[in-house]
Amino acid sequence: MKIIFLKREVKYIMNIKKTIIGNIPLLIWGEKKKKVYIAIHGNMSNKEDNVIKIFANIITKKDYQLISFDLPEHGERKDDTEYLCKAQNCVNDLNKVMNYAKRNYEEICIWACSMGAYFALLSYADEDIKKSIFLSPVVDMKVIIDNMMRWSNISEKELEEKKEIVTEFGQTLYFDYYSYVINHPIIKWNKNTSILYGSDDNMQEESIINNFSNKFNCDLTIYKGGEHFFHTKEQLAFYKEWLENIV
């Protein structure tokens, strides 16, 4: 498969290879290199999301390839109801992808968006990662689940008894997921990390992002008026310029 990018009448053709690790479909973007970025997408996204394509277009012109893959219940895996998109399953998948990268590359970096960043924090704290790039990251999943429980008037005891509850806004809460989050706090992240966060992000409070950035010495850029989902022409233009300055 090939994707053709057009810019100022100059064509850039990027080769994309499809492969699979167990039940995880992967895309490998660009010509063979010694360095690679692993991309972990966010909720309701997939391995070919527009923000991933933009990122791939930038880094494959440099010294990197990109590996992107579908999280459980996303992309090519959206119809698999046996293997759910829970933190423990995603950590398992991220570790498989990391092991693949270790076998094939000399240097590994990561790009992650939204809840994908949270899964990266859970999975890769002890890995040798040269650079981390986070777009609209979730860094405290417990706060998000607590908020959903409060909005739906669900207590921790009720969730424990019922094991899973479908909220009024369609999100299913799982006690084993919640327990995993509680038992695996983010206490270590000694990576060179750049974060792009929108000031109007309604998923993770700005104070939480600021505290995380200060605690782990991250380079934080706050885009005024930006949302959790970067999708407008202006937002994507800023995102692209930001990437070109940090990669």
Where do the model's predicted regions map?
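The serine-hydrolase catalytic nucleophile loop
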Residues: 44-56, 207
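Conserved alpha/beta-hydrolase
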Residues: 56-78
